[in-house]
Amino acid sequence: MKKTLLAAALLGSFAASAFAAPSVTLYGVVDTGLNYTHYRADDGKTASTDTFSEQSGQTASSRWGLRGDEKIGSVTVGFNLENGFNSDDGPEAMSRLFGREASVHVAGKYGTLYAGREGKLISTAGAAAMGGIFSPFSVLWGDAGIKAQTGTDWGRIDNSLTYVSPSFSGLEIRAQYSFKNDGTKTGDENSSDVDRYAALGVSYKNGPAQFGLIGDYSMWKNVAKATENVDNGFSVIAGGNYDFKAVRVYGQVNYFDNQSTLVNSVGGLDKFTATTSTTDEKGNLGYEGWGISLGATAPAFGGTVIAGVSYRDAEEVQGDNEYKRWEAALGYTYAFSKRTNAYAGVTYAQQKAEMKDKDQTPSAVGVMAGLVHKF
């Protein structure tokens, strides 16, 4: 729904010409729910923990945004500014006013070019994202999210250019490059002093079938003597979904090498995984491995049932530790209207850590329920 007057009020610090744009739209999503998690460390000293809390964005990230466009001759120029926030207690989710997206784009007969802060091609954030092709749980739903089934980063990048081609009988090509992944870090853009990123994706959609292939390449910064010759990271993911009317089936397989972290979402499974926060450490503790997942959605009882299973096998490139993870999840959504739906879900994740000194098999059970409202 277009809310031009309210959008103009929120944009009071912008140029007056923006107020008159008839296509400026204010939009948003609020997802608030309850979550119970049982975590078992299996380290011989840590007791199992049970947590019950109110949470934001369990199945749809809470956000608000402004978007608009203007037709200029044969091209369309537009923008998207999107803020993420925690609906359970109010603060910004990414310590930035427009942390989810801040971009401008130009669209014409030769495709669309985006510039600014965008979601990666492999993510589910932004108009160019392809992540929704591979899993019915997207990157959310706790441990069910596909980000914990791969070894790549499903986040966002600053200082980026993203190109999306026109559709050729259902076939689209996407290309993306970031001159500097994180604009808050020091270092000159497009230099070896900063992390950079490149990706190429191909998608195909024809009737009930949709498929995707993405390859991405992470160029780690080389500012420390110990890691100046560290290999860059890359990953490949291929998969898709097919609608059989009674059920839509999803599947994907992926491979990664020298990637920075193994993402773990719910239950504290990252407590034993050697995740790191700096690129220098990322290089030394990069991971190699593969993952696979299967999922499905089906109409039931007036709503939609969502189910999935997955497996990921990873090892340190320059170490001895290995991590084998599998997950299973079941969810349900019920729409009261086009704008409001309720959800419930249960997830189970187990990761066997085969380490030099000892082995661990921690696990987590998550139960969630909540309400999503869109405006």
Q: Predicted regions: what is each one?
A:
Residues 12, 68-70, 106-108, 165-166, ...:
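Residue-level signature of outer-membrane beta-barrel architecture
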Residues 74-77, 110-114, 170-173, 208-213, ...:
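Repeated loop/turn-to-beta-strand initiation elements of outer-membrane beta-barrel proteins
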Residues 193, 199-329:
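Detector for outer-membrane/organellar transmembrane beta-barrel domains
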Residues 30-36, 79-83, 117, 175-177, ...:
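Transmembrane beta-barrel strands of outer-membrane/channel proteins
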Residues 362-375:
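Outer-membrane beta-barrel "beta-signal"
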Residues 4, 48-62, 97-100, 155-159, ...:
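Residues that define the transmembrane beta-barrel architecture of outer-membrane proteins
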Residues 21-36, 51-182, 194, 203-210:
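Outer membrane beta-barrel
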Residues 1-23:
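Gram-negative bacterial Sec-dependent N-terminal signal peptides
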